[in-house]
Amino acid sequence: MGSCFSLQVSDQTLNRIFNCLIGKSYIRTLEKNLRALQREMEDLRAIQHEVQNKVARDEARHQRRLEAVQVWLDRVNSVDIECKDLLSVTPVELQKLCLCGLCSKYVCSSYKYGKKVFLLLEEVKKLNSEGNFDEVSQPPPRSEVEERPTQPTIGQEDMLEKAWNRLMEDGVGIMGLHGMGGVGKTTLFKKIHNKFAEIGGTFDIVIWIVVSKGVMISKLQEDIAEKLHLCDDLWKNKNESDKATDIHRVLKGKRFVLMLDDIWEKVDLEAIGIPYPSEVNKCKVAFTTRSREVCGEMGDHKPMQVNCLEPEDAWELFKNKVGDNTLSSDPVIVELAREVAQKCRGLPLALNVIGETMSSKTMVQEWEHAIHVFNTSAAEFSDMQNKILPILKYSYDSLGDEHIKSCFLYCALFPEDGEIYNEKLIDYWICEGFIGEDQVIKRARNKGYAMLGTLTRANLLTKVGTYYCVMHDVVREMALWIASDFGKQKENFVVQAGVGLHEIPKVKDWGAVRKMSLMDNDIEEITCESKCSELTTLFLQSNKLKNLPGAFIRYMQKLVVLDLSYNRDFNKLPEQISGLVSLQFLDLSNTSIEHMPIGLKELKKLTFLDLTYTDRLCSISGISRLLSLRLLRLLGSKVHGDASVLKELQQLQNLQELAITVSAELISLDQRLAKLISNLCIEGFLQKPFDLSFLASMENLSSLRVENSYFSEIKCRESETESSYLRINPKIPCFTNLSRLEIMKCHSMKDLTWILFAPNLVVLLIEDSREVGEIINKEKATNLTSITPFLKLEWLILYNLPKLESIYWSPLPFPVLLTMDVSNCPKLRKLPLNATSVSKVEEFEIHMYPPPEQENELEWEDDDTKNRFLPSIKPYKYFVYPGMSFLTV
């Protein structure tokens, strides 16, 4: 008898089973829905990408994304994650299906999964339909940026645009503006601040803080807290750390701009509580300072320098301050006003103050008097000591170190607007004792260059190329004002350089004079006596003196520096020179001195002696008695490096640097002397063949001139075969210190491939050498392709080279090249340039003679190169380049 099985099922259970199997068909349509979900999700991601691109473009234009767009993007991101999770288990879920996908082995599990897929598909479809935005952004609400009052400016428009654009770059979080006092940094900064009001609410808050010198962190925190409405009594009683926490808490959720005006040292943002600007938070910190060094400490290693105004802009500003009423009162006043404006050298502070002072002066005589005061003692000009010099003096005070301050004041001894030769300036400093007691010239000079860098970064001096610096005229007046004890001791520094004097100026109290500079005048004779018992520096260079009276120097026992250079007719030193017992620096270069006085041997402290281009000096006999001598220059002197001279020089045991001319027979130099040579001139060697490989032993050689000599090539080091003489270790250059090279009238030389081993060349001049066909020969440099020449070259001068066809066989980078001069080189048709060769093309010039009459006279690497450098070709003119004729600057 068969058995029977009976099961009772409730209606609710039957309904649930029915819904699983039939109601929504989640299982039956699972595979179809999965395929649809994948397609719809791909479409959604594409739409999402388009929307994000639109948002990015609009936000770059300082628009703000719509809230609905942000909500949609958030939902898409959430759905995308959910979809990836669902699809990751698809293979497992499909394995559960049976009956051709109409049913499942695990009905409830498949039902739940199918339902999730169906609902997600509907959500994705909905998002796809909602993603068609007509607008994704809107103008931001205007943030509350209170405009700062500013005066109309002239000549700062380009600088404002450049500074604003740089600050708004995504990769720039910190930006510094640096420049000398009174140059207009704060005015420019205010205009940048006010532009934030123009662009609306791109930033949540813009904070302006005047920092000034010596400000404490607590004061900065208080100023910032007031802007953030934090500064109540409870907050004021907190310590700096807690205040920083509060400031950070408020700012970290905001897109802020912090503008710090007039900082003198690094501002510790973290200690204040400022979140560090980044590409993520898109915040900005901007500041002004007088110090480039501070810019680096703050994290801006490419700060923007605010410079003085160009002459025409300066004149416009000055005219505005003086006013049309005064300028039109007499036609002569306009010309006199131009002269006064020029005295300000483009410094807005001076232009504003002096322009306002002169605005009521309607008589020609008043303007003539003003010019006279400027020329004789500018510090006495009305308002100069009240409104201009004290502002500039802050930079001087910030130097701190008294030696650096002395170095700065020393620069005021040079003429207005005159370029100062760095190395000679530092040698003066060394002898004056400003640099310390280091007896090693190289170390002392290195320290001097560090001090020079400090003055340059403080914007008290301006760098001019590699070899020179210059002091702004108004800064110079400030230095002279300080040196005179603020006008109380005007004869501390007697400075009348480059003013056309024909005689020594009258001095009331010679005993008060510490420094005297009468350089660059027309003084022919000194007839007065002086009792300069305190004088330490006497500059008489570049006059028309024929001698120096003994009576004039009799009382100068403290004189340390005496410069008589460039008195072309000067032929005799008095025997009273022996009384200058403190003398350390004596420069007689470019004079007609015929012999050294017997009393010279009494100068026991003399350490620097320059006899460059003393072409009438026949002997330096007795120089070996100058036992303290550390530097001797004989380049271009009639005294050449013959056996008798070298014998004397070998006795100078403290000698550290030698500049000398070698001619006639090649003398085998003492090894110690060879290492001391820094500047060498070789002339009149007509041997054939001639080998200058001995130069490689001169490890301190910085300047080399070869003239009227006969040799085919310079061998850097001995090698196994003639053909491989350049195949040496390129990591050990032969001429590491060589920075200046002149080759003149060397008619056997065909190339200068050996200069590959002079990686620090700054100046290269090749002149009147008829066989030179290329500068660097490709075949000889075959194994040296890893060496890139001319990376530090600033001046390339090629004169009268009839066979020259090539400088280098392919384009080269010239990172710092300023000028390329090519004259009478008819076969040179292509320069080693491409479109990326020179980074600062706006500062680069090519001078060619004869000038190319048509564009196709020169061959270019490509059209981009041609278009980039054609504007750089300028009319030919004669220059005196640094390094030409060595130290004749």
Curated annotation (Swiss-Prot):
InterPro entries: Apaf_helical (IPR042197), LRR_dom_sf (IPR032675), LRR_R13L4/SHOC2-like (IPR055414), NB-ARC (IPR002182), P-loop_NTPase (IPR027417), Plant_NBS-LRR (IPR050905), WH-like_DNA-bd_sf (IPR036388). One of its GO terms (biological process) is defense response. One of its GO terms (molecular function) is ATP binding. It comes from the Eukaryota. Residues 137-440 form the NB-ARC domain. The keyword tRNA processing does not apply. Residues 19-64 form a coiled coil. LRR repeats lie at residues 510-532, 533-555, 557-580, 581-603, 604-625, 626-652, 653-676, 698-721, 825-848. ATP binds at G179, M180, G181, G182, V183, G184, K185, T186. It holds the Pfam family NB-ARC. Residues 131-152 are annotated as: Disordered. Keywords: ATP-binding, Coiled coil, Leucine-rich repeat, Nucleotide-binding, Plant defense, Repeat. Belongs to the disease resistance NB-LRR family. Involved in disease resistance via the salicylic acid (SA) signaling pathway. Involved in shoot architecture development via the cytokinin signaling pathway. The LRR repeats probably act as specificity determinant of pathogen recognition. The gain-of-function mutant uni-1D (T-DNA tagging) exhibits bushy and severe dwarf phenotype, due to altered shoot architecture caused by enhanced axillary branch formation via the cytokinin pathway. Uni-1D plants exhibit constitutive expression of pathogenesis-related (PR) genes through salicylic acid accumulation. 'Uni' means sea urchin in Japanese. Interacts with RPT2A. This is Disease resistance protein UNI. It comes from Arabidopsis thaliana.
